């Protein structure tokens, strides 16, 4: 075992459940994520916020080990496991689930087939019955092609598909994008329930007020750098901070 792994294992009881430390990511020569560090406690929701182009999605993709952007320096840990040493499929097996902004519903497959496909490789997480209990609309449309669902229903399917894996960290990129307020409220209630079951979540959302009301803590990025880390309530109460970095 390496000195790095020994050190981490020895301090595991004190280490945060999730942490990224001084991560630097690039799209080819473009320096996107510039030395970002933060941690998330188990069962916590963290809102990752900032203006357009701040590096939010790039940070999520770096955590998920998508390879684009490429992590060139820094460490990422989840429950004692070094994500920074993993490829994307290894990070998924380790418990990372990314729900991208475009949801990536697979054409030609039904709702149920989209979920079943995610469970082909172990370890698996929530059962179909549990997912349908969480999202009754999916149960009603289980035999319908996934890409024919409404935007809100596709978002439910994308989240349900992620939960069907043995998930430890849920990464959500713009989950409220294009959704009616009533559907946003439904998704919020779902995320609150998932949190009550111990799920750790990082949410990137342009609707900063909605994300802050949901989250326990917040991180704000500006041009790829971290400019704030603290309680979500403090951001809601700090007009100057909101105006300067979130334009709200």
Labelled PLM ranges:
Residues 2-248:
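Glycine-rich phosphate-binding loops of nucleotide-dependent enzymes
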């Amino acid at each position: 075992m390496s000195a790095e792994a020994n050190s981490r294992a020895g301090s595991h009881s004190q280490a945060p459940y999730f942490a990224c430390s001084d991560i630097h990511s690039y799209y080819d020569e473009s320096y996107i994520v510039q030395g970002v560090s933060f941690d998330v406690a188990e069962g916590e929701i963290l809102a990752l916020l900032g203006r357009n182009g701040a590096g939010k999605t790039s940070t999520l993709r770096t955590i998920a080990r998508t390879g684009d952007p490429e992590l060139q320096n820094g460490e990422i840990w989840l429950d004692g496991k070094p994500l920074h040493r993993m490829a994307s499929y290894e990070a998924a097996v380790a418990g990372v689930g990314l729900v991208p902004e475009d949801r990536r519903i697979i054409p030609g497959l039904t709702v149920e087939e989209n979920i079943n496909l995610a469970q082909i490789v172990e370890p698996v997480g929530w059962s179909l019955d549990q997912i349908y209990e969480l999202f009754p609309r999916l149960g009603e449309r289980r035999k319908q092609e996934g890409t024919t669902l409404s935007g809100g229903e596709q978002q439910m399917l994308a989240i349900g598909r992620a939960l069907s894996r043995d998930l430890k960290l849920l990464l959500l990129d713009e989950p409220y994008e294009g959704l009616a307020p009533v559907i946003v409220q439904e998704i919020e209630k779902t995320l609150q329930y998932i949190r009550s079951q111990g799920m750790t979540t990082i949410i990137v959302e342009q609707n900063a007020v909605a994300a802050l009301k949901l989250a326990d803590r917040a991180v704000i990025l500006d041009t790829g750098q971290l400019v704030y880390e603290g309680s979500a309530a403090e951001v809601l109460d700090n007009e100057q901070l909101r105006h300067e970095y979130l334009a709200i």
